[in-house]
Structures are given as C-alpha cells and as structure tokens.
From Swiss-Prot:
It is an enzyme of class 3 (hydrolase). GO terms for biological process: L-histidine biosynthetic process. It comes from Saccharolobus islandicus (strain M.16.27) (Sulfolobus islandicus). Its main location: cytoplasm. PANTHER family: HISTIDINE BIOSYNTHESIS BIFUNCTIONAL PROTEIN, HISTIDINE BIOSYNTHESIS BIFUNCTIONAL PROTEIN HIS7. Gene3D superfamilies: MazG-like (1.10.287.1080). This is Phosphoribosyl-ATP pyrophosphatase. Pathway: Amino-acid biosynthesis; L-histidine biosynthesis; L-histidine from 5-phospho-alpha-D-ribose 1-diphosphate: step 2/9.
Length: 94
C-alpha cells in the first residue's frame, strides 16, 4: 500500500468542494465553515486517542481513518496538499 489512497481521497474531497453534490458529507461539513472542520479534527483526535488506550485494533484503525479524512478536508480548505505534507516529512527526515 502506498500514499496513493490519500492522494485519491484528497482529489475526491476537492471535487466535492468544487461541485457541491447534494448529500455529500464533505459538502455538509465544509458548508459549516473552517472552524467547524477544525473542531471535527479535534474530536477525531480525541476519539483516536481513546481508541488507542481502551479499544481494539480495528476500532483504532477506524478512528485513524476518520482523523485522516477530516485532516484532508481541513488541508483542502487551507490550500495545503498531501504533497506539501510529504515534502515537509521528507525535509524533517534529513
């Protein structure tokens, strides 16, 4: 598995933000504003921590996936791409 799925999901998020399809969860949270999306990232962070301490591996994986999704939405609103993050991680590795 590679970072390809993250890139694909980010592109779907951008598409949803641009086209605003009815019934899209992405559109629903984006319409509530950046502060709302940032709060969702915070909520998902807490849920990820709780799952790591008190729940099974499958639940932890599910919460990490939720956190990554909400981070990607917030990144899209900030104009930050996964490539920006990959470059920063690579820079820190050196």
């Amino acid at each position: 598995m590679s970072n390809e799925i993250v890139d694909k999901l980010y592109k779907v998020i951008l598409d949803r933000i641009e086209k605003r399809p009815t019934g899209s969860y992405t559109v629903e949270i984006v319409n509530k504003g950046k502060a709302y999306v940032a709060r969702k990232v915070g909520e998902e962070s807490v849920e990820t921590i709780v799952a790591s301490l008190a729940e099974n591996k499958e639940r932890f994986i599910s919460e990490v996936a939720d956190l990554i999704y909400h981070l990607l939405v917030l990144m899209a609103l900030e104009g930050v791409t996964p490539d920006d993050i990959y470059r920063e991680l690579e820079r820190r590795r050196k």
